[in-house]
Amino acid sequence: MFQRTKTLLAGLAASTMLTAAAFAGELIINTDTSDPAPKKAFEEVIAGFEAENPDIKVTWNLFDHEGYKTSIRNFLTADAPDLANWYAGNRMLPYVNAGLFEAVDDVWEENGLNESLASAKGSMTIDGKIWGVPYTYYQWGVYYRKDLFEANNIAVPKNWDEFKAAGETLKAAGITPITIGTKYLWTAGGVFDYLNLRTNGYEFHMALTRGEIAWTDDRVRATMANWKELLDAGFFLENHAAFSWQEALAPMVQGEAAMYVMGNFAVAPLREAGLTDDQLGFFQFPMINSDVPMAEEAPTDTIHLTANGKNKENGKKFLAYLARADVQTQINETMGQLPINKNSSVGDDKFLQAGYEMLSNTDGGIAQFFDRDAPAEMAKAGMEGFQEFMVKPERLDKILERLEKVRMRINK
């Protein structure tokens, strides 16, 4: 654990009154932003906050990821900081339900965040209250070989029929429509998320991952039926269960596959493998159900006011600072990700620009990712089931029955 503290002013404890004032000027922040880019971003944001608030002494406790996951419930209960980082959506739910996070609707109201952070408001809301401030996310969607589309006269598909037609054209040209590597399961979770969001919408998807809807529900079956259309048409890379997500990049680089449902972190290795920005493009996962608003997948990092922290007002002051457009621009420039504040700016990278435009205009909700939105046991069973379905779609009934047993056990 790394600790950063601002040196106390000389003679601060000289009087009881000054000591009381010093206590009022403290702020303790716990995070697991220990990778180089997030660590640098937090160093910068804390330095900026201190420069604007010289009367507040910031103590920053930095954990490694695994240590943080095992420690967070304990320190929120027994030795709470004022602020702690976590994730949006259902990942907040255990700490909200346990009374360990505090609602910050007032911070949003007083700082115009209902408008400037509107795209992420749904993922920050539980039981009608807002439980933190989001500061970074990155998009998922469809990354594709523009040159292969152009060579086969394929326009970017906007809806399900156009998407399937594009796949058929690619297959006829001897090109695998969609590459994927499901060896480590989570990539199949991303495909399920988008199919379910497009078929049934954000509210249904979140209720399903919370365990409130049966896996044998007809609406889940409708999602799986849409997936089966792609499987029956042979759209996915053969033997995908043997490949990692990185290994599945190779067919796309070699021109043997045209699309990948993936997060923006795939761009760097695709470029490093030799694809140019003239060859590589991005589009929003197409509409399936026109009655369903277009929700997106964008894992979101957040900061939360703790219920047991001692310096509530200073915590709220930091949250307001963190939400500012200029601050989110700076953080995400350092991290190479996207600001949530719609008044922030992004650099010249075309994929960041495309993601920022898409997410800033999203009104259907922001999902986090299957293994963030579902409890760990359900996420593991679900992603195992998705991979199995992609290999053996005829086992659908058994897979859904198995997932329903897991849901019932978790929620009994």
Which residues are covered by each model-predicted region?
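A structural signal for short loop-to-beta-strand junctions that line the ligand-binding cleft
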Residues: 81-82, 112-148, 176-180, 292-295, ...
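Extracytoplasmic/periplasmic substrate-recognition and gating elements
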Residues: 47, 51-52, 152, 225, ...
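Extracytoplasmic/periplasmic solute-binding protein
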Residues: 127, 131-135, 140, 164-213, ...
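Glycine-centered hinge/linker elements that transmit conformational signals in sensory
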Residues: 167-169, 210-240
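Hinge/lid segment of periplasmic solute-binding proteins
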Residues: 87-140, 164, 191-193, 219, ...
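Short, solvent-exposed loop/beta-turn-alpha elements that line the ligand-binding surface or hinge
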Residues: 102-116, 182, 199-222, 272-275, ...
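Conserved C-terminal helix/tail region of periplasmic/extracytoplasmic solute-binding proteins
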Residues: 51-52, 57, 150, 329, ...
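Extracytoplasmic "Venus flytrap"/periplasmic binding protein-like
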Residues: 44-116, 123-125, 147-158, 258-259, ...
